Amino acid sequence: MLLTIDVGNTNLTLGLYNGDQLGRHWRLATDHARMPDEYGLQFLGLLQNAGKTITDLTGIVLASVVPNLTGRVIHACQEYLKQEPLVVDTGVKTGIRIRYEDPRQVGADRVADAVAVLRLYGGPACVIDFGTATTFNAITKAGDYLGGAITAGVNLAAEALYTHAAKLPRMDLQRPPSVIGRNTVHAMQSGLLFGYVSMVEGMVARFRSELGSDMKVIATGGLAEVVAKETDVIDIISPWLTLDGLRIIWELNQ
């Protein structure tokens, strides 16, 4: 089995693949203070939870956008899972052409998303990944990754409001009863959710004007389903898109 690991700023996502089929998968909170031994023991526990041992693993592929954790996770894989992980970085075969001015600046998760979309859905496409940051990524029919746009994720925006506006409370992101909020919490929920949806709709329209009217829109990440319920511009929700991309990258490098 192949273990895929996506290390993000907020979540650490793992999945076990048997061929192209995703089996057990986990989304954990990223802990920036955790040491390599702690990660290693946690990974062993997850394998045990899935009824597997390290002898069942045929490989590990890793994407990380958290530099200070990358080495710790690699060490955990080496010492506890007895595997040298394939790390998505420059020099790794991806099957796409990255047209960024400096390809080294493209996050490994964005690369994995693009690889998965091109293989599973084809281009032209706009991939929206709702994470700590929300990214919009443009992929052509020919397999070129053109770049995209990066903005603060909705939870990050909510935290900024709470932190920097003294009278605004911390609240859960839920759909308010109406766009016009009748109290502070509903007003914040309206601004964050509906304002965010409007931003997504506007960005999709702008991407479509450059990629063409046949552009597909694929959404992934923790808030993809929440946003998709409020708009019709999202064609496909693919919750584990990044892990699918990591699996494909692994296959391309064997």
Residue ranges and their predicted role:
Residues 50-105, 142-148, 153-154, 182-193, ...:
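Short beta-strand-loop/turn "lid" adjacent to the catalytic site in phosphate-handling enzymes
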Residues 10-12, 134, 225:
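Glycine-centered loop/turn positions within well-structured domains
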